[in-house]
């Protein structure tokens, strides 16, 4: 690929810096361009030396070129003349070593064949052109082949009229024509920027083309206005729209949106009677069932935050979480109660049956700035730590999901993720802001691929979540017949 600097731009730039030879200026521009392209302020380039020491060598025939590694160190606060002078000083020192074969450097450095090469792109400054000045003849030389190119090779031709031509050779296995063309446009734009502003610092030069800047602005234009709403607000609004639609089910219970709201409000009042105030936290140690979902919604309705306790965790882990978080109340079952009875000062609410409902006005005590839940880290880097996640963050996530992967009233979402895993949050709430249905897998069923096949088929699940390892096990358990029969409704899988 042959390039020419924008008309007059390189000449204008050289006029601003008369103390800098044009060859040095061109080298500084290209090394800066390469460094900014690859995101490296320090890299090794190859520089071609003639290796013709003395007048006799200058007229000898045959190829004697040598390529030596040039350490390029870019500084963001440096201007172009300073960079050009530094590189020129480096090359002056290197010239005395131009007879030191690159192959010998590899051997002397103890490098093995195939290891990281001495340099990446190769640079060459040619202070001549291809035109031959012969009496009465207009002639031009042509380079038929330069040999294989490992990465990039650039030959710089600063001409006597102040222009700059560049020959760019590239490894076709690494670069295509479209990529090289765009990189070339960036180099031309870089030259124009310095011509317009000679004092521009190297770190301030813009590498994006105008259309790329526009594209980036549009691609990153993701700002949205988040409504001042809470999780309970969104669910209540949907319940008003579709009160008799199917909302929540497990193997033993089924609730419409109206019935679910009645249970949530009843539980919120029960929590208030137990002393739970807005801003408090309530621990939940329930096996997977409709009551686990109702408990989380009831806690949010009361303005509190839930602390999920996976009943599959060891007792010591659960005790540590309770001691750290100091919840106001623990919602559990009679079967689980024995695990917590010796924790000093802990109040309990056993919850495994629907509550009596009334016409009580919904509390709606949660506010957007309230904490929605507390989740503990895995502890892989030390003691697990509790993290408080706010209502606004979850509302933002759920509205984004509904915008990108919209659920409808025809969707059935599987709740199979343990409640101690943050991914479970969208399972517990997303369906209820879209009029969809949430179905609860049996406790521990998420570990059994065959049980999940039966579960998906029984409820006609359309949307589910898998961690990659479990998805692999699930797929391995399928046969062509079972996939068609058990998964005929499934359309969305989140990893």
Placement of each model-derived feature along the sequence:
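Flexible, P/S/T/G-rich "lid" or insertion loops adjacent to the active sites of thioester-utilizing
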Residues: 1-20, 110, 208-213, 241, ...
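His-Asp-centered acyl/peptidyl-transfer active-site segments
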Residues: 15-27, 37-142, 172-176, 277-280, ...
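Conserved acidic residues
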Residues: 120, 319, 328, 411, ...
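Active-site beta-alpha turn of Rossmann-fold NAD(P)-dependent dehydrogenases/reductases
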Residues: 286-287, 375-378, 411, 417-418, ...
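Adenylate-forming
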Residues: 287, 334-337, 417-420, 442-445, ...
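Carrier-protein-dependent adenylate-forming modules in NRPS/ANL systems
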Residues: 37, 67-69, 78, 98, ...
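Conserved AMP-binding/adenylation subdomain of ANL enzymes
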Residues: 385-414, 422-462, 477
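Flexible, Gly/Pro-enriched loop and linker segments at secondary-structure and domain junctions
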Residues: 1-8, 22-24, 41-47, 55, ...
């Amino acid at each position: 690929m042959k390039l020419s600097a924008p008309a007059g731009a390189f000449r204008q730039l050289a006029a601003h810096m008369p103390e800098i030879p044009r060859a040095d200026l061109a080298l500084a521009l290209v090394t800066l361009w390469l460094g900014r392209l690859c995101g490296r302020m320090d890299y090794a380039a190859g520089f071609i030396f003639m290796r013709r020491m003395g007048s006799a060598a200058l007229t000898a025939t045959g190829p004697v070129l040598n390529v030596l590694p040039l350490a390029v160190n870019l500084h963001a606060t440096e201007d172009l003349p300073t960079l050009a002078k530094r590189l020129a000083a480096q090359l002056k020192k290197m010239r005395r070593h131009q007879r030191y074969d690159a192959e010998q450097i590899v051997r002397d450095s103890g490098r093995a064949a195939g290891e990281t090469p001495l340099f990446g792109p190769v640079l060459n400054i040619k202070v001549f052109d291809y035109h031959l000045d012969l009496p009465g003849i207009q002639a031009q030389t042509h380079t038929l082949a330069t040999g294989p190119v490992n990465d990039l090779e650039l030959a710089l031709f600063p001409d006597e009229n102040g222009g700059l031509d560049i020959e760019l050779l590239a490894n076709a296995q690494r670069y295509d024509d479209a990529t090289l063309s765009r990189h070339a446009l960036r180099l031309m734009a870089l030259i124009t920027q310095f011509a317009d502003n000679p004092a521009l610092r190297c770190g301030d030069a813009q590498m994006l083309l105008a259309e790329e800047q526009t594209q980036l602005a549009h691609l990153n234009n993701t700002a949205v206005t988040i409504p001042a709403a809470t999780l309970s607000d969104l669910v209540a609004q949907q319940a008003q729209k579709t009160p008799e639609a199917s909302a929540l089910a497990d193997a033993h219970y089924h609730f419409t949106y109206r019935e679910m709201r009645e249970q949530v409000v009843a539980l919120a009042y029960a929590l208030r009677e137990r002393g739970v105030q807005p801003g408090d936290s309530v621990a939940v140690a329930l096996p997977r069932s409709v009551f686990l979902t109702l408990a989380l919604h009831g806690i949010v309705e009361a303005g509190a935050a839930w602390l999920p306790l996976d009943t599959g965790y060891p007792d010591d882990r659960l005790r540590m979480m309770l001691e750290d978080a100091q919840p106001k109340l623990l919602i559990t079952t009679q079967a689980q109660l024995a695990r917590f009875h010796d924790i000093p000062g802990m109040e309990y609410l056993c919850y495994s049956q629907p509550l009596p409902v009334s016409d009580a006005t919904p509390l709606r005590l949660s506010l957007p700035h309230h904490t929605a839940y507390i989740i503990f880290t895995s502890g892989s880097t030390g003691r697990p730590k509790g993290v408080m996640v706010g209502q606004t963050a979850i509302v933002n996530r759920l509205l984004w999901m509904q915008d990108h992967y919209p659920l409808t009233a025809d969707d059935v979402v599987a709740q199979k993720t343990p409640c101690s895993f943050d991914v479970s949050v969208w399972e517990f709430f997303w369906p209820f802001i879209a009029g969809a249905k949430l179905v609860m897998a049996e406790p521990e069923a998420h570990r059994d691929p065959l049980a999940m096949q039966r579960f998906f088929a029984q409820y006609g699940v359309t949307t589910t979540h898998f961690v990659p390892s479990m998805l692999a096990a699930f797929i391995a358990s399928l046969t062509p017949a079972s996939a068609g029969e058990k998964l005929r409704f499934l359309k969305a899988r989140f990893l």
